[in-house]
C-alpha cells in the first residue's frame, strides 16, 4: 500500500504590514504564525492593508522570517521599515504568473497553497482568463 501525504487545512494567516519599493509590494505576516505552520499546506490569507496606488502594477511578495528573532514589515509604505532578516517569497497565481498589487484588496480573504521548503506561495482562488 502506498503512502499518502496529508496537506493540513484550516490555517489562517493575517497580513500585518505592507512595504513598497520600485520593484515590488511586500506584505508582512506574524513570524510566530508562519513558523507554526507545517512545511506544506493550505491557508486562508486575510489581507488587512491597502496597496498604495504606486504598487498596483508591481509583483506581490510575502515577507517570511528566516530566524526565530525577526519581525516582518511594518505598516509604513517604505521598504526601509523592513526587518532585513526576512525573505520575500513571490506570490503567484495557479499558472505560476506573478500576482500584482491590484489583485490584493484590503479587507478580503484569499485561499493559498504554501510550501515553505520550496519557497512557494500560490493563490488558489484566481486564474488567468484566456485571450479569445
Please annotate each region the language model reported.
Residues 1-18, 129-132:
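Short, intrinsically disordered N-terminal pre-domain segments
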Residues 3, 23-25, 71:
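Aromatic-residue detector
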Residues 37, 47-132:
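Acidic, glycine/polar-enriched metal-coordinating patches/loops
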Residues 11-40, 50-56:
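Surface-exposed ligand/attachment interfaces on beta-rich extracellular proteins
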Amino acid at each position: 500500500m502506498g503512502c499518502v501525504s496529508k496537506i493540513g487545512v484550516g490555517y489562517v494567516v493575517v497580513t500585518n504590514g505592507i512595504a513598497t519599493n520600485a520593484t515590488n509590494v511586500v506584505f508582512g505576516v506574524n513570524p510566530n504564525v508562519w513558523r507554526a505552520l507545517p512545511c506544506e499546506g493550505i491557508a486562508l490569507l486575510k489581507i488587512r492593508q491597502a496597496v498604495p496606488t504606486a504598487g498596483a502594477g508591481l509583483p506581490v511578495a510575502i515577507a517570511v522570517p528566516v530566524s526565530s528573532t525577526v519581525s516582518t514589515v511594518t505598516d509604513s509604505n517604505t521598504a526601509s521599515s523592513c526587518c532585513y532578516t526576512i525573505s520575500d517569497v513571490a506570490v503567484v497565481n495557479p499558472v505560476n504568473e506573478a500576482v500584482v498589487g491590484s489583485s490584493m484588496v484590503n479587507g478580503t480573504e484569499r485561499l493559498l497553497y504554501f510550501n515553505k521548503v520550496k519557497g512557494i506561495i500560490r493563490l488558489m482562488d484566481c486564474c488567468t482568463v484566456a485571450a479569445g
